[in-house]
From Swiss-Prot:
It holds the Pfam family Elong-fact-P_C. One of its GO terms (cellular component) is cytoplasm. InterPro entries: Elong-fact-P_C, NA-bd_OB-fold, Rib_uL2_dom2, Transl_elong_fac_P/YeiP, Transl_elong_KOW-like, Transl_elong_p-like_YeiP, Transl_elong_P/YeiP_cen, Transl_elong_P/YeiP_CS. Belongs to the elongation factor P family. It comes from Yersinia pestis. This is Elongation factor P-like protein. The lineage of its organism: Bacteria, Pseudomonadati, Pseudomonadota, Gammaproteobacteria, Enterobacterales.
Length: 190
């Protein structure tokens, strides 16, 4: 058991008999005195794949479930399945494209370090990505010499099809660092 304010992204909870994986959390602090902070959580139902949204007060208890995390690397595509290989014992983990559609936007060709699969009692639940990823821009408006001092953004398309806002001075072919959860530009990659 954990309080709602202790729940983090990537944790699993048992809610009304459903096994739910926490995808996103919004914290809402009401301005009225004495009002408790609300936590709006977006879940993915592990069994059905449906998205579920619930609100909790900070002191409400939730039934957490212990998950096993295994480090993996992207291996290959087999039809509509994506195969990830365990780094230690080379166990293959197969995901259907629909299961990891959002995550695929952040996985560059050849994979990325820091990926993990979440399992519970041998059942494959989800693919978890690291906080950031370095990607190459394939298309964006040309950079402007002497761009204004104000921070203006423009859309940029990555090699995976992901579109995010980047500063005006960034040009195609540059590698940038992206915060995965917030889908935002963090800076140029090393």
């Amino acid at each position: 058991m954990a309080k709602a304010n202790e729940i983090k992204r990537g944790m699993a909870v048992n809610l009304n008999g459903k096994l739910l994986l926490v995808k996103d959390i919004d914290v809402q602090s009401p301005s009225a005195r004495g009002a408790s902070t609300l936590y709006k959580m977006r879940f993915s139902d592990v069994r059905t794949g449906l998205k579920v949204e619930e609100r909790f007060k900070g002191d409400e208890n939730l039934d957490t479930i212990t998950l096993t995390r295994r480090a993996v690397n992207f291996s290959y595509i087999d039809g509509d399945e994506y195969v990830f290989m365990d780094d230690e014992d080379y166990t293959p983990y197969n995901f259907k494209k629909e299961q990891i559609e959002d995550e695929l936007l952040f996985i560059p060709e050849g994979g990325m370090p820091g990926m993990q699969v979440l399992t519970m009692e041998g059942q494959l639940l989800a693919l978890e990505l690291p906080q950031t990823v370095d990607m190459e821009i394939v298309d964006t408006a040309p950079s402007i010499k002497g761009a204004s001092a104000s921070a203006r953004n423009k859309p940029a398309i990555m090699s995976t099809g992901l579109s995010i806002q980047v500063p005006e001075y960034i040009s195609p072919g540059e590698k940038i660092r992206i915060h995965i959860a917030e889908r935002r530009y963090m800076g140029r990659a090393d």
